[in-house]
């Protein structure tokens, strides 16, 4: 294999290089073609210019004649007279006026100047309407010619910042029009740059600061619409050359080549960055643009309203784009993908804009130390208004009135907050806030934009910034973002409260700050460390931030998106989320959203949160009360966390021992398990497996601890490895649990949470609120302590957790009994074993349980084995996916249960239970599957981390995942089950096969192990 692989790699490299070479050649050809076209164009330019001059002169004469005629006919409405000529004529009229004025100064080249000015005026008038050529003027080549001239020049011009196009003698309208048009037309990935470069000019245009007010207003409207209209085209058109095609038909020949060139150029920039840039521009024009226009359009008013917004363009980039990025990133983070940003951006924009609003004060403060507090409050409320209003109606408020209403609202809110926040505004040290906010803002935007997942991390960064610059930051935060504080209030709610209270409650802030500092400092640890033991306590409160953050977004998100969000957070932030419930679940553990609401009543509803935050934070009494509540909560959290830490430490030690033993066993098994041997002595291998499983069962008793301990840590994967002696085949799984499970993913938490979350998910199937609340706590074994305190006892006896959770449904009760049945074996497995037994077996019972139940009566062990082999097959497949892992986990635990000697006697009741309750569990699980479908959707992605197993366990494992994978594996799994059904020997061989399957799946291509499976099945 290695030898062919190397040649393959060698061949692949030449292939890649050849492809790249071809691409380079093609790009070079495109460049040459472009250069040749440009050269020809330049060569023909004299003649073209002469013709254009003639035509321009003729047009000018015609315009003058028409003017004279109209003036003679109606002296009153010269403008109205020009109107009949359509847009070009009116445009040409002012152009002609300009030409007349220009003729005086430039008699030397009047024709050229006339040509340029008239052509530009016509094009500028026509292009905003996308080549409005009503009177045939555009049909003359001025439109095309001008666009042709701008085609190459326009590209170079846009690359050069667009000075050449605009300055050609057009004082206001054409320059701004052409520049923005070029920005719109030639947005070959340069559009963001152009817009940023043109931010000032755009501001002047939009602000109507041009000398000719009416024109810029009309142009600003047109241009505002045009770039927005073109942006999608540009984004979709891979550089906007498509948008150019209408205006520049001459470039149509080069369209594909230009696309390729632009794509090649754009490839240099990461797609995510490009998306961020486009979404920035696009979103700035959509959601933020009303606020953005508020920042841009009324520069004078903004200067009055916000002295800090004098750098409105810069701020709009930093703030608006962070907001947009926050929306996109947050949604990406939510798993809603950045696509819904446009729609969800109001809501997400509300929550995330709050985050960014918090950063906005930094930007705002950066410019105005003079108005730090009020300015921040202003900007915060302003952004919040734009945010809250969008949340109320997606962009409704922003769309209701362009910038002026926003200006008025901002001014009103500024006044209100000036009145409300005088206390906080005064305490906020402008420079301190500036420094802190600048730090927070910059660090925030870099983290926030590129890493939507990091966004929680960026809040943690904020929190660190807050904690570091806490005293300075937080007063500013309270003032600048009393509402934005809402999102932070949970992450930094104690921070914000503590900082807000510093002015009012210094004692509480100090205590909260200490705790907050711990949380803020630990949250990064928890965020970056998956270990629940360490990250748990710190991440607990930070994750309350996430919880608040999650619920905030989650309310906006659909259930699937919520589940997805949970899923994704679980992968990365799931520890946070689960931790979040603990921190916030202190009181409302079961209701994570309510919990965020409880801890930070305002966060769940961002707008409400912002309002509440503003009012309670504004009122020192409310702040004091909130601070007291938070202090109580923090004290409770500290106590709980201490208890949890102790439990986690114990569990962690147990986990380490168990993991070490399991890893040793797994590695030994893996080393001692060549697939061919199992093919030959499958039945003999089964006793070996029994020994192995008994070993795992021995490890499983440890895994009972692992159930909780691994549950907190890599339980999901370690269990696959340890529980699944088959796991040795899944050595990757075991390694995954050990490495990724414990460290990489919060899988430690997930594992813990999976055992529990699955339990809770099962229970959650019964209680979705528990799913939300408990799985996160479970996900965070440490913070799972809160739910775990219920679940931890349960998790300590995973069967107990299943018992309670499983009590929710008959299948859950089955799981509970199951979990209790092989507590030693199943505890690590229980979440999955009982889950797998309950839900998967239920599902398998659905699928295979009819057989299994019949088999179980005859062969109680057969059930486990049939389920196990099928599960093993699933596991093999499951190895492919996290869900598969989690299910593989349950399925493997199944094998250990069955293979474990105890599993046999215990499983007979289990099988009987499965048979008896499996039908019941099938409906309950069907219900959980239905109830969990949202979860299972969330689970599926979470499934990778084991909640999907839980949801899948309850819903999918049997039905969707078990079936989906079984669908693949059903043929194989059922064959195993059937082969197992005839006799336990077949099942034992199947158990051996499960190891075989694991090893095969691990070490072999699909064809190889399928062939081997066929051989095994044939032998049986």
From Swiss-Prot:
InterPro entries: MAML1-3 (IPR046369), MAML1_3_TAD1 (IPR048456), MAML1_3_TAD2 (IPR048455), MAML_N_sf (IPR046370), Mastermind-like_N (IPR019082)
Residue spans of biased composition, Polar residues class: 124-133, 344-369, 399-410, 491-515, 794-818, 837-864
Tissues showing expression: At E9.5, strongly expressed in the telencephalon, first branchial arch, forelimb buds and somites. By 10.5 dpc, continuously expressed in brain and spinal cord. Also expressed in first and second branchial arches and limb buds. By 11.5 dpc, expression in CNS is weak but increases in mesodermal tissues. At 14.5 dpc, detected in epithelial cells in trachea, esophagus and proximal and distal tubules of the developing lungs.
Residues bearing PTM N6-acetyllysine: 827
Location of region: Required for interaction with NOTCH proteins: 1-97
Main location (coarse class): nucleus
SMART domains in UniProt: MamL-1
UniProt organism field: Mus musculus
Compositionally biased spans, kind Basic residues: 67-76
Modified residues (Phosphoserine): 45, 127, 310, 321, 367, 1019
Identification of the protein by name: Mastermind-like protein 1
